[in-house]
A protein has these predicted regions:
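Glycine/Thr-rich beta-alpha phosphate-binding loop at enzyme active sites
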Residues: 2-15, 66-129
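Glycine-rich phosphate-binding active-site loops on the catalytic face of alpha/beta enzymes
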Residues: 68-78, 137, 143-167
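Glycine- and other small-residue-rich loops at beta-strand/loop junctions that grip anionic moieties
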Residues: 8, 43-46, 98-101, 132-136, ...
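Loop-centered beta-sheet repeat module
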Residues: 1-34, 42-44
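Alpha-helical structural signal in soluble globular domains
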Residues: 22-26, 30, 59-64, 111, ...
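Generic structural signal for well-ordered alpha-helices
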Residues: 13-24, 54-59, 106-110, 143
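Short beta-strand/loop segments at the ligand-binding rim of alpha/beta enzyme cores
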Residues: 28-49, 114-133
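Catalytic cores of alpha/beta
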Residues: 49-63, 118-127, 137-154
């Protein structure tokens, strides 16, 4: 969350490895008293990561056997916004979602899918790890763009909030 100081540092390789290794270790423990087994673990990443940082995330996700990646969370970038700088400063820090995130989200989805290579057993040619696209999805065309970039699924939130169930 961009609203929490220092929280994004947890997406750095060493911090992320500690967290995900422990989480997956606990997740894989079977509890016979409840009959519960492992639950899917997906990691939602920031669109502000560099490609080197995304490579680190991909490597960790495959190494630790995460069930998927979600690209991408809210951004701290304010580039290309029409809102005047003084108004942005008055609003303060926080994550930006929706349409301003659309292009970067698609770029991150495509990058992850390209880096994880298509599996021959997947009729849709998806990569070694499922990627859920999130960010800037307001129309069916937006969803199609994410799928064409390699996403296995799309996650709609801001579009749903602004457009309602008729999205």
């Amino acid at each position: 969350s961009p609203n929490t100081p220092g929280l994004r540092e947890l997406q750095e390789k060493d911090s992320l490895r500690k967290i995900l290794t422990h989480l997956q270790s606990e997740n894989l423990k079977f509890d016979p008293s409840t009959g519960s087994g492992p639950k899917p673990i997906l990691l939602k990443i920031a669109p502000d990561l560099t490609y080197e940082q995304i490579d680190d995330v991909i490597d960790l996700a495959l190494e630790i056997r995460l069930d998927g990646l979600v690209a991408a969370n809210t951004t701290i970038s304010r580039e290309n916004l029409l809102t005047h700088t003084s108004k942005l400063e008055a609003i303060g820090a926080g994550g930006l979602s929706g349409l301003p995130l659309k292009q970067r989200s698609t770029e991150v989805v495509k990058y992850i899918c390209d880096k994880t290579e298509a599996r021959p057993d997947d009729p849709f040619g998806r990569g070694k790890i499922p990627v859920i696209a999130s960010g800037g999805i307001f129309t069916g065309e937006d969803a199609k763009e994410k799928i064409n970039a390699g996403a296995s699924l799309v996650q709609v939130w801001t579009g749903f909030i602004y457009e309602g169930p008729g999205i």
